[in-house]
Amino acid sequence: MAMSFEWPWQYRFPPFFTLQPNVDTRQKQLAAWCSLVLSFCRLHKQSSMTVMEAQESPLFNNVKLQRKLPVESIQIVLEELRKKGNLEWLDKNKSSFLIMWRRPEEWGKLIYQWVSRSGQNNSVFTLYELTSGEDTEEEEFHGLDEATLLRALQALQQEHKAEIITVSDGRGVKFF
């Protein structure tokens, strides 16, 4: 059941692909770009990307309008997402990044709610069971990439709700 993506009205507006010089207009434009990136990545369950992939993806490249957001502007949008806690650079050159349409704390909260709701406190899970197991198929965190999952579990560990452990076939987590 693939859902289609609903592009915002701005995406069909050519000036959207040029960052505006007016401070107020630019802030609204950056907010719209950030919202678009997060919605797009969430729908496509895309959690990491390079800047070059981003530039060529439909996200920043409207083929129909023949407009593309310049790479310098993409960097500004990505930096705005980083400031909001939704992006983490994966290298010093800032050429690849982890996109988090939910912050790690939010993922942790969702996972912990599922654990509590299903009566599985004091249980141990492998990372695979959490993101790929049959029990989590209906959960939003099903299919979550390992890097984001670990950040979510680290957030829970800081709240003393979980402990990341080593199990025979890799890493796991015990929930309290």
From Swiss-Prot:
Transcription regulation listed as a keyword: yes
Major location (coarse): cytoplasm
Any single biological process term in GO: protein transport to vacuole involved in ubiquitin-dependent protein catabolic process via the multivesicular body sorting pathway
Domain of life per record: Eukaryota
InterPro entries, A to Z: ESCRT-II_cplx_Vps25-sub, ESCRT-II_cplx_Vps25-sub_N, WH-like_DNA-bd_sf, WH_DNA-bd_sf
Keywords, comma-separated and alphabetical: Cytoplasm, Endosome, Membrane, Nucleus, Protein transport, Transcription, Transcription regulation, Transport
An annotated Gene Ontology molecular function: protein homodimerization activity
Cell compartments where the protein resides: Cytoplasm; Endosome membrane; Nucleus
Record's keyword annotation contains Transport: yes
Assigned GO CC terms: cytoplasm; cytosol; endosome membrane; ESCRT II complex; nucleus
Similarity comment: family membership: Belongs to the VPS25 family.
Subunit (UniProt): Component of a complex at least composed of ELL, SNF8/EAP30, VPS25/EAP20 and VPS36/EAP45. Component of the endosomal sorting complex required for transport II (ESCRT-II), composed of SNF8, VPS36 and 2 copies of VPS25. Interacts with CFTR; the interaction requires misfolded CFTR. Interacts (via C-terminal half) with the ESCRT-III subunit CHMP6 (via N-terminal half).
Protein's job: Component of the ESCRT-II complex (endosomal sorting complex required for transport II), which is required for multivesicular body (MVB) formation and sorting of endosomal cargo proteins into MVBs. The MVB pathway mediates delivery of transmembrane proteins into the lumen of the lysosome for degradation. The ESCRT-II complex is probably involved in the recruitment of the ESCRT-III complex. The ESCRT-II complex may also play a role in transcription regulation, possibly via its interaction with ELL.
UniProt name for this protein: Vacuolar protein-sorting-associated protein 25
Species whose genome carries this gene: Rattus norvegicus (Rat)
Name of the gene encoding the protein in the UniProt record: Vps25
